[in-house]
């Protein structure tokens, strides 16, 4: 994300009150925010401008505070269970996603479990464009490994951005204990992993001969393990 012209290690990402930025965050483009499952977010606060006084270092351009859903207790003291699930298919990137969540609530205990698995294919742009503009966005050639050699192949469908596909898995588990009406203990566990995330802007570069400059250029695979205990 870019806030007020700043990005990467100049924009602070906070998850459930815990800063996500660390010492290895570089100043170039970052994809760490994709490790946050949008299906478990309760609210997202975006603060534009410097916020280092309140949130600490790295908040030069702004702050993005992600707050995930909480485990819900039974309202009437009796056991309550709720949940939801969905599947999603998308033609623009051949997306196949599956999400399921279950909430179990008692008078003093509560549990929230969430699982999201996604398989994103290569992005596909529209075939028709402005004839008065260039078509540099088209993927006319791509690199592949054939017979143990890097080979440039012609893309039969230039609107398909070959090399932009990846897979992702997101898990969340929250356990809450409320001994009385004034105190709540919460254990928050989150895990996210994915396949290699292609850096498409590099893979789409071509040399003077029209061939791809790079056969492979990946981010990751990024893995995020989050564990937090809170007492309210």
What are the language-model segments listed below?
Residues 1-19, 42:
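Extracytoplasmic beta-strand/coil segments of soluble accessory domains associated
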Residues 1-2, 13-14, 30-34, 46, ...:
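N-terminal periplasmic accessory domains that precede
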Residues 11, 77-83, 96-98, 107-111, ...:
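Outer-envelope beta-barrel architecture signal
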Residues 20-50:
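Short acidic/polar hinge/loop motifs at secondary-structure boundaries
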């Amino acid at each position: 994300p870019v806030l007020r012209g700043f990005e990467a290690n100049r924009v602070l990402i906070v998850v459930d009150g815990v800063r996500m930025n660390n010492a290895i965050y570089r100043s170039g483009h970052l994809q760490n925010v994709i490790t946050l499952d949008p299906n478990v977010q309760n609210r997202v606060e975006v603060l534009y401008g410097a916020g280092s006084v309140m949130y600490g270092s790295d908040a030069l351009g702004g702050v993005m505070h992600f707050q995930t859903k909480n485990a819900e207790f039974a309202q009437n003291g009796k056991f309550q269970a709720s949940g939801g699930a969905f599947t999603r298919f998308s033609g623009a990137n051949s997306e196949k996603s599956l999400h399921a969540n279950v909430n179990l609530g008692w008078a003093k205990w509560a549990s929230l479990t969430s699982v999201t698995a996604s398989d994103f294919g290569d992005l596909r742009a529209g075939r028709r464009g402005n004839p008065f503009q260039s078509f540099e966005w088209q993927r006319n050639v791509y690199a592949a490994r054939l017979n143990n050699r890097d080979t440039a192949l012609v893309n039969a469908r230039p609107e398909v951005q070959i090399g932009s596909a990846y897979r992702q898995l997101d898990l969340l588990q929250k356990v809450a204990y409320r001994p009385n009406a004034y105190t709540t203990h919460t254990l928050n566990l989150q895990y996210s992993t994915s396949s290699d995330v292609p850096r498409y802007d590099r893979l789409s570069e071509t040399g003077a001969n029209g061939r791809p400059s790079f056969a492979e250029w990946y981010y990751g695979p990024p893995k995020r393990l989050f564990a937090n205990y809170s007492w309210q």
